[in-house]
Amino acid sequence: MFTKEVTDSKLYKWFNERLEIQAISDDISSKYVPPHVNIFYCLGGITLTCFIIQFATGFAMTFYYKPTVAEAFTSVQYIMNEVNFGWLIRSIHRWSASMMVLMMILHIFRVYLTGGFKRPRELTWITGVIMATITVSFGVTGYSLPWDQVGYWAVKIVSGVPAAIPVVGDQMVELLRGGASVGQATLTRFYSLHTFVLPWLIAVFMLAHFLMIRKQGISGPL
């Protein structure tokens, strides 16, 4: 993985004595790749790439977005029309969101059709399903943030769905909305979920997912 010039340098040797860089490098670069692996096994990596793009573009927009019912829509218009390359950043965010969902669905189908969920990879499959649920939640919460007519009514409908659940339904609706009706508290909750809670959750499950794949390797053919 490293060239001879790098491994012979004093700086590399200094770090290698303390961090065992060479052992880590050998482990990363020497993993066995089964001969049946094809391009469809890259769908999970493409989904991760889309998530990284989402994180970067979303982080950039937080500098200008204002999560209030009075200023949310105006701030989105400001990003699109006034911020340098703001229109491009937001467009990439939207396109990569759609691409992430599509790649995730195809990845799930690939894993299911090739039996990648079977023993001993049940936990890998479970973490993947949890991440799929979180990804859908990203879409639901992000859809509301522009606080336009589409976003407002989408939130009103989605947050009202739990009302059909017996006993606790009304309490769940009030928890989601932050009150009896959709308003500032709702937008604040959805913004917090979209930019803080869900990213941390998916990061934890991604780490567990990748560590298990690394430990168990790629599943064999059917």
From Swiss-Prot:
SUPFAM superfamilies: Transmembrane di-heme cytochromes. Heme c binds at C42. One of its GO terms (biological process) is respiratory electron transport chain. InterPro entries: Cyt_b/b6_N, Cyt_B6_PetB, Cytb/b6-like_sf, Cytochrome_b_N_euk/bac, Di-haem_cyt_TM. Signal peptide: none annotated. Binds 2 heme b groups non-covalently with two histidine residues as axial ligands. Binds one heme group covalently by a single cysteine link with no axial amino acid ligand. This heme was named heme ci. Heme b 1 binds at H107, H209. Its cofactor is heme b; heme c. It is a multi-pass membrane protein. It is found in: Cellular thylakoid membrane. GO terms for cellular component: plasma membrane-derived thylakoid membrane. This is Cytochrome b6. It comes from Picosynechococcus sp. (strain ATCC 27264 / PCC 7002 / PR-6) (Agmenellum quadruplicatum). The lineage of its organism: Bacteria, Bacillati, Cyanobacteriota, Cyanophyceae, Oscillatoriophycideae.
